[in-house]
Amino acid sequence: MNQNETQWDKLLKIKTTGRDDSRSDQYRYPYEPTQYCVLERLANNGLITKKNVLLDYGTGKGRVCFYLSYQTRCRSIGVEYDERIFESAEANREHAVSGRKVSFELTSAEKY
């Protein structure tokens, strides 16, 4: 695990590091968070501002939502179908620095 990944999680007061293959199969992908270096490039390109609402399908534990809401001040909505992972995202939201700008929906992308 990259030190940068751990540092950002600590700063944002969330727990999103590590891969989880426990529920992956031919129809479902494993939980694997987007690297912070990728999110940093996205945040710095100027396309997302505080006037935007970010919609993150397959949000997992919410890393994309928390980071981009923190960096750009946008509002974020994460959509997750796996109840166990969704509960981790909600637990993160309770403590996250940007938690008030983030919400999660437990449903499939098709139904949202």
Which residues make up each language-model segment?
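Conserved class I S-adenosyl-L-methionine
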Residues: 51-60
